[in-house]
Amino acid sequence: MENKPLWTITRVLEWTKQYFANKGIENPRLDAEILLCAVLKCERITLYVHFDQPLDDTELAEYRSYVTRRANQEPLAYILGTKAFMKHSFKVTPAVLVPRPETELLVESVAKAAVGAGAENLLDIGTGSGAIIVSLLDLLPQSKGCLLYTSDAADE
């Protein structure tokens, strides 16, 4: 009987970090940790506390699938299906743009301008994930918002 190598959390992360680095992934260790946390349904601290925990075949298969997708430059948000933005987590698919950190600056600027103009109604055309309008309504609770989708796929 052949002994399979034991893939512990540490071993998987080290291998993936090197693999991602070779593929030009900007934050190889962080991305490896985020994907492994998604597979194990845990927080990142758990990876360090249980560093010697072996992964089972099902976990390895799911992780391998995620790693392959990320190595092909697919954004983490599309692999995970969600993206945190301001106070919320939004569902994202390839049919919508992934909310970016600089979009938070846009939302804050629009909120300030809306307050200054006394705007009560907001219109978001091409809503996508809804990150912009939802975040604006959080900042402007007295306002009302209207969403217009330009893609049926984004509405799903």
Give each language-model segment a name.
Residues 13, 32-33, 63, 73-76, ...:
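A general structural signal for well-ordered alpha-helical segments in protein cores
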